[in-house]
C-alpha cells in the first residue's frame, strides 16, 4: 500500500449521457482514491482501478493543484481531470521506467485488439502482456493482436475506456485466480521496443474512463469523442455481389488460363459476382508491380476479355519490394523504404521474401511513387482496383524511423498506410485499421483456418464481425468462405455453414469453388447469395446511419437488451440494424440451435412463427439447408 492515500475522496459532478435527448440528466458520480484503488462510481456501480502499481511501497503521495485531482509521488505524478462524461487519468513519470494501472473486470468487457480466438466478451481469453500494436497475429498466435485494433474497451456496467495515442502501451488480461477468466485489464507504459520517444521526453500514460447508464449508452456517447465516422459508402456492387478471389482455390499457382477458367466457371453456373480478384503471384518479382510475362503474357487482353464478360478485375498488392527485384535499387536510392536514424534502409522479412524493403508510408514522396505505379498499372492493363494486403506495424524492421511524431511510432505506419491506399476509392479492401474509421472502405478479417472451432475457425467469424463494428469499421469483409485451406480444404458441411454464416454480413467473398463439392453445395451457396442481395437495401440504410452516428451495421445482441446476461454473452448471433437477427449454425452436425431473442415480437423466417422476447429458444430439426434469421415485428 502506498502511504498517504487513505481517505482521499473527490466528488465530481459528471454529466452522464441520458437516454432521452430532450430530458438530459445529470448524475453525481464519485471519484474515490482509497487503498491504492481509484474508483469511478456511476449509475450501475463503479469502475475499480488498481493504480500506480509500479510506485514503490511506502511512497507518500502529496496533493498537488493540477487538474481536478492531483497526487505527486516524487517518482511519478497522476492528474485526474473531468472531461464531459469522462475522467482523464494522466500519469507522468520522473524516475520510473514503467507506469502501470489495472482495471478490475467486473461485468463483461468488449473491444481492444483483433484476436486469433476473438472471444466475446474478452474476459473469456486471458492474455499475457504484449505491446499493443497492429500485428500479423498469424505469425505469433495467442501473443500478438491483429491489424484491426483500437485501444478502446467498453463494459456491460456502462464504462468505456480509451488509452490515448502516444502512450507506449503494453496490455495484458491476467487470470489471477486460475479459473481461465481474465480478472483485470492492465495498461503498462514503457519506452521499450517497438515504441520510441524523443530524447529526454518523460514517460507518460494517459487514458479516459467514461460512463453511461449501460453498455450501449456508454459506447454511443464515448465513441464519437475518440473516433471519426465513415465519410461515405464503399462500392455498392461489393455490398451486393460476391468477390471471387483466386487465393484459397489456387494459392500461388495462378496464371491467365486459370483466372479465365475461374471466371467462366462462376458465370456458367449462374453465380452473381462483383469482381474477380487475382491474388498472390501475379508479379514478375514481389514488389515490382509488373505482371509475370510467363504467367500473364498479355494482361490487358485478359482484363479486357473479363470486362467483356461483365467482370471487374482487382489485384492483390502489398507494401514490400524484395531486394532481388529491379525496382528495389531505385526505391532504395530515393529513400522510399523505412530507414534507420542514419538514413540506411532496414530490411524486413515477410511471407514471400526473406530480404525486402518496406515502403515508408509516412514519407510523402514514397507514397506518391508507390501509388503512381499502381495507377500506371491500371492505365496500362485496365485493372479496376486493388486488394491491399499487410500494413501491420509488426512488419517494420526492429531498427526504424518514421516521418511522424515519435510518440506515435510504430502504429502510425498502419494509419498512414490506410490513409494512402484509400485514395483508390471504395472498391478496395484492407486488412488493417487503427484510427482510420473515416475511410469508407471494406476492412477484411485476417485469414481464417478451414476448421470449425474457436482457434481462428468458423466460430470466430461472428465475434470478429462484432469486434470490427464496435471499433468503428462497419464494412466488414469476412475473408474467404470456407477459410483459406492452408492445410486441408473444408468438407461440404463446413463450407455450407461458412457460407450461411456470411449471408447477412456486409460482403461475401468466395474462393474455394462451390461446384468443387457437389450440386447440393452449389445450390446452398446460390441461396446464400440470393438472400444476401435481399438485405442490401437495409445495409445501405445502415451505412448511411453509420456516417451520422457511428453505429455499427453488424450489432451485438446486447444492443437491444444491454441489461440481460444472455444478451451480453451471445457470441454466435448478431443483429443487422435493430430489427433483423441472424443466428448461423456453427457446430458440426448440429440439429438444434439456441437463440437469444431481445425484447419484441420476432418472426422466424423459416416457419413464420412469432416469439415474444426477451427469451432464449431452442430450435429443433436443424438441417444443412437451415439459414436461421428473424425479423422484429413493428409495434402498434
Feature-to-residue mapping (PLM):
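Cleavable N-terminal signal peptides of Sec/SRP-targeted secreted and luminal proteins
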Residues: 2-20
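Catalytic-domain carbohydrate-binding cleft regions of carbohydrate-active enzymes
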Residues: 23-48, 55, 66, 81-82, ...
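Accessory, solvent-exposed terminal regions and/or long lumenal/extracellular loops of proteins
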Residues: 634-636
Amino acid at each position: 500500500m502506498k502511504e498517504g492515500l487513505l481517505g482521499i475522496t473527490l466528488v465530481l459532478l459528471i454529466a452522464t449521457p441520458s437516454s432521452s435527448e430532450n430530458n438530459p440528466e445529470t448524475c453525481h458520480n464519485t471519484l474515490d482514491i482509497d487503498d491504492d484503488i481509484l474508483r469511478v462510481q456511476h449509475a450501475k456501480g463503479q469502475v475499480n482501478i488498481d493504480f500506480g502499481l509500479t510506485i514503490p511501497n511506502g511512497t507518500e503521495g502529496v496533493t498537488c493543484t493540477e487538474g481536478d485531482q492531483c497526487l505527486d509521488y516524487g517518482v511519478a505524478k497522476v492528474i485526474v481531470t473531468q472531461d464531459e462524461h469522462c475522467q482523464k487519468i494522466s500519469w507522468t513519470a520522473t524516475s520510473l521506467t514503467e507506469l502501470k494501472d489495472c482495471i478490475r473486470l467486473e461485468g463483461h468487457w468488449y473491444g481492444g485488439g483483433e484476436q486469433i480466438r476473438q472471444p466475446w466478451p474478452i474476459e473469456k481469453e486471458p492474455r499475457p502482456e504484449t505491446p499493443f500494436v497492429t500485428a500479423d497475429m498469424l505469425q505469433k498466435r495467442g501473443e500478438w493482436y491483429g491489424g484491426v485494433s483500437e485501444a478502446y474497451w467498453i463494459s456491460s456496467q456502462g464504462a468505456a475506456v480509451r488509452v490515448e495515442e502516444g502512450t507506449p502501451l503494453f496490455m495484458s488480461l491476467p487470470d489471477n485466480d486460475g479459473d481461465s477468466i481474465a480478472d483485470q485489464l492492465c495498461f503498462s507504459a514503457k519506452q521499450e521496443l517497438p515504441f520510441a520517444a524523443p530524447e529526454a521526453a518523460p514517460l507518460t500514460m494517459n487514458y479516459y474512463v467514461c460512463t453511461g447508464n449501460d453498455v450501449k449508452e456508454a459506447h454511443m456517447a464515448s465513441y464519437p469523442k475518440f473516433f471519426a465516422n465513415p465519410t461515405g459508402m464503399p462500392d455498392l456492387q461489393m455490398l451486393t455481389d460476391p468477390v471471387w478471389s483466386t487465393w484459397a482455390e489456387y494459392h500461388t499457382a495462378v496464371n491467365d488460363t486459370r483466372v479465365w477458367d475461374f471466371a467462366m466457371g462462376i458465370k456458367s453456373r449462374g453465380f452473381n459476382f462483383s469482381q474477380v480478384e487475382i491474388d498472390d503471384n501475379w508479379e514478375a518479382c514481389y514488389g515490382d508491380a509488373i505482371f509475370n510475362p510467363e504467367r500473364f503474357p498479355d494482361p490487358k487482353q485478359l482484363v479486357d476479355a473479363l470486362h467483356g464478360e461483365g467482370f471487374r478485375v482487382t489485384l492483390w498488392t502489398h507494401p514490400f519490394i524484395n531486394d532481388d527485384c529491379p525496382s528495389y535499387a531505385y526505391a532504395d536510392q530515393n529513400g522510399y523504404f523505412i530507414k534507420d536514424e542514419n538514413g540506411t534502409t532496414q530490411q524486413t522479412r515477410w511471407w514471400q521474401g526473406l530480404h525486402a524493403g518496406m515502403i515508408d508510408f509516412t514519407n510523402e514522396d514514397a507514397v506518391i511513387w508507390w501509388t503512381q505505379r499502381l495507377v500506371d498499372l491500371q492505365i496500362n492493363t485496365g485493372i479496376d482496383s486493388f486488394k491491399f494486403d499487410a500494413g501491420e506495424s509488426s512488419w517494420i524492421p526492429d531498427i526504424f524511423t518514421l516521418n511522424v511524431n515519435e510518440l506515435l511510432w510504430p502504429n502510425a505506419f498502419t494509419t498512414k498506410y490506410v490513409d494512402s491506399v484509400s485514395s483508390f476509392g471504395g472498391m478496395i479492401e484492407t486488412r488493417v485499421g487503427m484510427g482510420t474509421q473515416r475511410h469508407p472502405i471494406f476492412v477484411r478479417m485476417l485469414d481464417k483456418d478451414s476448421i470449425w472451432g474457436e482457434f481462428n475457425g468458423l466460430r470466430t467469424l461472428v465475434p470478429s464481425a462484432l469486434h470490427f463494428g464496435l471499433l468503428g469499421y462497419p464494412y466488414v469483409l469476412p475473408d474467404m468462405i470456407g477459410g483459406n485451406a492452408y492445410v486441408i480444404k473444408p468438407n461440404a458441411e463446413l463450407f455450407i455453414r461458412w457460407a450461411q454464416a456470411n449471408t447477412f454480413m456486409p460482403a461475401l467473398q468466395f474462393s474455394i469453388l462451390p461446384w468443387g463439392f457437389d450440386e447440393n453445395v452449389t445450390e446452398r451457396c446460390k441461396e446464400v447469395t440470393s438472400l444476401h442481395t435481399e438485405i442490401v437495401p437495409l445495409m445501405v440504410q445502415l451505412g448511411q446511419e453509420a456516417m451520422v452516428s457511428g453505429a455499427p451495421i453488424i450489432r451485438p445482441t446486447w444492443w437491444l437488451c444491454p441489461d440481460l446476461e444472455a444478451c451480453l454473452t451471445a457470441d454466435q448471433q448478431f443483429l443487422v440494424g435493430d430489427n433483423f437477427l441472424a443466428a448461423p449454425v456453427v457446430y458440426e452436425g448440429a440439429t438444434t440451435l439456441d437463440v437469444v431473442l431481445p425484447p419484441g415480437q420476432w418472426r422466424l423466417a423459416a416457419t413464420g412463427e412469432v416469439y415474444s422476447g426477451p427469451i432464449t429458444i431452442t430450435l429443433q430439426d436443424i438441417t444443412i439447408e437451415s439459414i436461421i434469421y428473424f425479423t422484429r415485428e413493428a409495434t402498434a
